[in-house]
């Protein structure tokens, strides 16, 4: 049973890089288990009306929910899931008063609706929502769920299943008995119903009812058990967002689908003849009328294949009065606008709605007043600096301040900023050597909680004054085993690819390297490819682990270069969308080669002992390196990589020529392959097929397969096993290459 578990940790009001350095820790080479000894926090949330936080911790495979309340913010473990069994814990949500936290146990479903079962439990997997009281007591299971929505008062969890809306009662009596256990629908309506948004007082639930060619915004009244639709039309309405007082809803409206984009089965009704009436969206076809000549020309006329509003624009923002259901448009972009026409989500903030758009090199956030006074969106964030997505932003409880993180002025890190949602000059809250992400304001308005890290401190929960300053760390306290004084500060080095493009890299140099020594070296290539490695611990779990791995490799004596190749993020849209990458020409591989040649040029690197490793897209580039340049790379570790683009085997096809499989005849270097066979990101067949190519050419390979596991293994023990195998493999084929 779960209990409240205080965690020994005090607020440390110091900068992240000001850390103790006990000399006793440096007596022997550290292990990866020691590097991973601190718990890894993520999914930070804050109550709106109480100074209380909640988050998820992954600690040696054990996934639990934690909380901390002001003013001391002492961390407390709320749950007791103490097995390294691969059962994920995610999606925490906290009630406005901070009394209830819900969370999901179980991995997300794949396309077949099957959850991950990495421990191969004979009971099979499930994905269920649980609840726990922050005051203490055992967590309890509510039932199976996909994406739960907790009411602000913490009484109800709503969710969609099979296109209908269901609910669980968190508090007894919150729902009628036949609905409270998720067995009978809360709302049984036509179409596909989802996008659930609770009103601020928790008495109403807004939802999107998609109906193919059109869609509605629905409102379910919990007390009256009544559904109403806001200004129903032939158009497609999405992204409902509530005003602070709960009396109005803003939403996005796009034109309904024209005949030429509709797809519907004939029902022999009037205007709907037997057979397929229209083809797939965007492929207008003749109806299935007997005798219609094959290849007959399609009709052409305005409004048949594309749809616009009067005035020529394709998207508009509307606001509705919830009581009356009446609505009106309050803003639309110019006709054929290429930037704002792509907006698909808005959030009510202050007197307007805010949204993200990418007009140039960087994603920016804008506001439009709901009263319709503004003719054009007002930019809130600058036209420089990388904001990854809306997930890296949050609003103050009153909606008057936007908090976000970006890399403005410090392109290799992230820092937190704030700006009024009515417009004004952005103000930095954090600076310096740290990496601060996912800002979440505390209800009292005095502090902002962040995920914070630096080159030596792993990801932590920190509190920053709203006036700015260094994060005060509340979790985790670093274990004695954590090898902080074995770590190095990565250096930013620039390389130039064969086509002249400059590439940012991080260089990890062993602490004990001596003048005149030539060390073995490794290139690390991240996945994605829309990722950016930083000069410190990363905010994403695998890259947090990969940073620790690169530090560990440096502690083992390797020189490590982490390459931020083109098609990654952090350096602008032109870099992210660089031409001729991926299956269109593999241009990013030039950047990997440039990294290897840079290492070869260093006087402290043995040019004949360079290896490479990476996961996912990093595995893809590892396989490219070994297939195309076994003369540069003596060995590699390829975790869940892609080796053949698409399913075309034509040797003249560009995608095939861009694949590692096309160059496999040049593959001479040994490789360690690691893959889970329930990978939902990269098909396991990519590794199966590659092994056959390598066997046919007598290329040395070692293979680790994790049955029922996913893209990034969910079981800690498997990572430790993988690292042990990697250590032995690299020692044999890189450290001792040619010896």
Model-found features: residue ranges?
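Beta-strand-rich domains and repeat architectures in extracellular enzymes and scaffolds
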Residues: 33-63
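Serine-hydrolase catalytic core recognition
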Residues: 258, 313-315, 343, 350-351, ...
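Hydrophobic beta-strand positions that form the internal "hydrophobic ladder"
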Residues: 53, 98-101, 157, 202-205, ...
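A flexible loop/linker signature enriched in serine peptidases of the S9 family
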Residues: 56-66, 81-88, 104-130, 141-144, ...
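Short loop/turn segments that connect beta-strands within beta-propeller blades
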Residues: 69-73, 133-137, 170-173, 221-225, ...
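A short beta-strand motif characteristic of beta-propeller blades
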Residues: 31-35, 76-81, 138-141, 182-187, ...
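Residue-level detector of Asp-centered blade-edge/turn motifs that repeat once per structural unit
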Residues: 48-49, 96-97, 152-153, 200-201, ...
